[in-house]
Amino acid sequence: MPVITLPDGSKREFAHPVSTLDVAADIGPGLAKACIAGRVNGELKDACDLIETDAELSIITAKDEEGIEILRHSCAHLLGHAIKQLWPQTKMAIGPVIDNGFYYDIDLEHKLTQEDIEALEKRMLELAKTNYDVVKRVVSWQEARDTFAARGEEYKIAILDENISKDATPALYHHEEYTDMCRGPHVPNMRFCHHFKLMSIAGAYWRGNSENKMLQRIYGTAWADKKALSTHLARLEEAAKRDHRKIGKQLDLYHMQEEAPGMVFWHNDGWSIFLELERFIRRKLNQYTYQEVKGPLMMDRVLWERSGHWDKYSEAMFTTSSENREYAVKPMNCPGHVQIFNQGLKSYRDLPLRMAEFGCCHRNEPSGSLHGLMRVRGFTQDDAHIFCTEDQVQAEVSSCIQMVYDTYSTFGFENIVVKLSTRPEKRIGDDAMWDRAEEALKQALRANNIEFTILPGEGAFYGPKIEFTLHDCLDRAWQCGTVQLDYALPSRLGATYVAEDNSRQTPVMIHRAILGSLERFLGILIEEYAGRFPTWLAPMQVVVMNITDKQADYVEEVVKFFKEQGIRASFDLRNEKIGFKIREHTLRRVPYLLVVGDQEMENKEVAVRTRDGVDLGKMRIEDFAAKIHQQISLRSLKLLEE
């Protein structure tokens, strides 16, 4: 007679084993209709799974995040159901849930076209609209293998052979004549899967190994209702307009090419923004009392073996050899910073020692994962490492947190999600050390009034960490900042300091990044601002245009004055209509467009308008320069008169 305890503390007693769906029906028909799955004693279960003993139960509906994930997973199975009807020879590989959707990797000789995707989506909807029940069967490993062998599903057989123990009891989910295998849970009925859209097709190697066969990956998105789907698609449409790759080309900021995959060719205007970002962070480093250093691009393999990176990262490291020595191009800066710390005797009086670098790093990311500036192989990291005593950890972490928020607010990012990752099962150090480390991070966050979520067991083996994820104007999440405690690397690389009692002690190392990769952060900014950079960041802040040739000399004089004032300015003296020139520079997103005619030249003025078409009237050039200087010094996100 199981007693079921609900989230509100109420209890329901049953005379026999019950499913989540039974409990929902006992509460009311509305909840039974909405029930997707259950969380039984903290574990997600299918709505049909029987509960035989006393348990705590949360009923999952489409209003819950887990409910949305489950219906997305079931949409992947629905895709499999439809594709096997349209192309019966298809072999199904894997179909997991991803952010905002799902995908399925398939092996099909026929190369799918956009027309095929539309036909597939139509068939999926036709099937879903029949509202058929999804039937779950738990079977033996052998029965599961026999089922897929009879269907010629070689990838499912490979998963069973290579990933699932022979004494396991896999779950098979039957969508009418289509059968799939999954740990679940899944929706009990396809009425939950009416609001989806197939988005794109890509290539993907089986098991992510380039030596294996290239499969076709079909991406889709799925939501609980029509409104949520429409909102998401509208957001994607806006994101496409803001795509940094598209805007980067329009504004001539950078390019990438096949001969250097994942490496950026910065053009003048893009490099101007990059340098401005670097200058901004450098001012922050000075404000927060950091040393700035520069380590070598390559170091001997021996050092990477001592640091432990060779075991964990060697596949992602570019290597070269010379004179019978093997070198690795650095994927990160930390071992180099420990080498700098180790030069000369350090005392407790030297701590905390804050060491920062704009480190040029390289990682051999898979070519299929490269994506504009967001995922590259060569990048610049605004990396810093703080060497301190254990007693100094909380204060140093608190300072890092302040620096993160101080920096992000300058760019207009206010919605920041913070997560604290705690001790994993496999770790160095004793529980007392981890207790102190985790408590120091918690206290630093609380001291700054930061709300945070704890991710149990997600920390690195060498220490807990804080992750800062910013949300942009389209509510997309970008994990950029990190503060990571490290109790291992200083010891591995022999870093010590002389303590107050003259003993040799190992410092705690704090890894700290604010922007992360400057390339990636610049990509985020391009999309956040849609290329309409605030004045202080804009590669060209002012363009001055003449109406006739008579004003050409005065225009050049004005631009020379602005440049002397440190304002990035240019002139446009082309023999074109002024409307044409204004339109062209508006498309280039130049913040201020200055027009000079006879009257402006005579009065030593300029007619000022913004890229948004706002007419600010006539100003003396000294007055305009003063206003712009104030904007730049304040790093204002708005233009004049906004």
UniProtKB/Swiss-Prot annotation:
Highest rank taxon of the organism = Bacteria
From the Swiss-Prot or TrEMBL record, state where the protein is found: Cytoplasm
Main localisation, per the record? cytoplasm
Q: Which GO terms describe its cellular component?
A: cytosol
Q: Does the keyword Hydrolase apply?
A: no
Where does the sequence pass through the membrane?
Answer: none
Co-factor: note: Binds 1 zinc ion per subunit.
Q: Which UniProt keywords apply?
A: Aminoacyl-tRNA synthetase, ATP-binding, Cytoplasm, Ligase, Metal-binding, Nucleotide-binding, Protein biosynthesis, RNA-binding, tRNA-binding, Zinc
Q: How does it assemble?
A: Homodimer.
Q: What is its EC number?
A: 6.1.1.3
Record's catalysed reaction(s)? tRNA(Thr) + L-threonine + ATP = L-threonyl-tRNA(Thr) + AMP + diphosphate + H(+)
Q: Name one Pfam family in it.
A: TGS
Task: Give one GO biological process term.
Answer: threonyl-tRNA aminoacylation
Q: Which HAMAP family match?
A: Thr_tRNA_synth
> What is the designated name of this protein?
Threonine--tRNA ligase
* UniProt keyword tRNA-binding present: yes
Question: Could you say which cofactors this protein requires?
Answer: Zn(2+)
Q: Do you know which InterPro entries this protein is assigned to?
A: aa-tRNA-synt_IIb (IPR002314), aa-tRNA-synth_II (IPR006195), aa-tRNA-synth_II/BPL/LPL (IPR045864), Anticodon-bd (IPR004154), Anticodon-bd_dom_sf (IPR036621), Beta-grasp_dom_sf (IPR012675), TGS (IPR004095), TGS-like (IPR012676)
The primary gene name is thrS
